[in-house]
Amino acid sequence: YVVQGQGKYKITDNGKDVDVEFIPEANFVGTADGITIRRTDANGATTGWGLNGNRVVKGEGEDGATLTLISDQVQLQNSPSKGSMDGRYIPTVTPKPITAEPKTSKDVQGKAQKETPVFKTDAGTDNEKVITPSATTPAKLIDPVTKVPTEAKTVTVDGEGTYTINPETGEVTFQPLPTFTGRAKGIGVSLTAPVGVDKTGAQVTSTATTTYTPEVTPVKPTAEPATSTGLQGETQTGKPTFTAGDAEVPIKEGSVKLLNDNGTEAQGAVPALDPNGNKVGEYTVNPATGVVTFTPTDKTYVGPVVPAKVQAEDNNGTKVETKYTPSIVGVKPTATPAESTNIQGEAQSGTVAFAPGKATIAGVEKSVAIKANSAVLLDKQGNPVAPGTPVDAEDANGNKVGEYTIDPATNTVTFTPTDKTYTGTVVPANVQAEDENGTKVKTTYTPTI
């Protein structure tokens, strides 16, 4: 017996009973109309009787005069209502559940991840069928607070990131916060879709819920320190190397910065100090190139310089720190004394020579020039005298016998006798000059009378 839109029934005798089999149509779900089954005994009587006004023998109820009618499908002739003692079979077809396996993914810090849950009926059987979301039956995220599906396409999980769903495909994208690492709490994904129709032709749906749990692996950039070697008083540069922890998370452009002693980010130049805390120069950095510059402010200083702290960060904001250390190669100018001889009572002069200090750095010879017009005479206490001021020239006993003057442009020292009767040894004139760094060098000029 076939009921269109529902299925077919097959009955088989089983002694005094009847076996009934219902084979539903492929899309039918819910409660069927059912069938009524009437039996006839050997006398020709049937189960098709009901409220006919006759007393029931050995019936039910207080007076034993009633029976519960089985079938509400049949209305007997001359009966005011439906009901008979016929057999009744009403099958119910349970909707197929939709299932979906949880999804996971793993990628590096800061990078978006995505997965698409697959919804199925009869999963793992020969009748397995994929249920695809659509515009009319969209997949939805489950709000982590209310625990129910939400119409919102994007859900934010504090401290982790945002989940965005494509309702028509079910694809979920997780965009982690740049600083988040580890296994996320995950997000629920729900799909309600039709799995069949009932006897009225109305669609019957089933709902499945699964989860998507991404994991974020940390990315840590690395750094190599830089050093440089330069001549005393010379500006030096060095470029620390910053390397991304992953190709997907490069070092942020323009992020190279200097740090103050306390680790805070410097807003400008940072003092370069000697080990005793004295300022000997300044550090600056070009954020675009990452080049750090050491500019000496005390060009006379030779010795260790406390390294500059240099920091950069990747696109996730993960910071890494290293150092830049300049080394100063000291140079000292040299001097050659001068002598002269002349007759008693005559002025005489000699030219002292000053030569730049030199050093070879990385195979290149470098020098620091003598400062122009820096030659001066020194008094008996070793102090420079003002330009144009003569210095007394004395004999071995401390008696003044003349005066020394100097031409700083030529380094020529002139002895002018004031006691023209004197002959013999004259105490040499002390002459000093300095290079461009301010490093001083001394020599002498000795006249003989």
Language-model features, listed with the residues they occupy:
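Surface-exposed or secretory-pathway low-complexity segments enriched in glycine-proline
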Residues: 1-19, 23, 88, 112-169, ...
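Acidic, turn/loop-rich segments in luminal/extracellular domains of secretory-pathway
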Residues: 2-64, 80, 153-207, 272-321, ...
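Intrinsically disordered, low-complexity proline-rich tandem-repeat tracts
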Residues: 24, 91, 98, 102, ...
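Extracellular interdomain linkers/hinges and stalk-like, low-complexity segments
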Residues: 38-129, 192-253, 314-366, 435-449
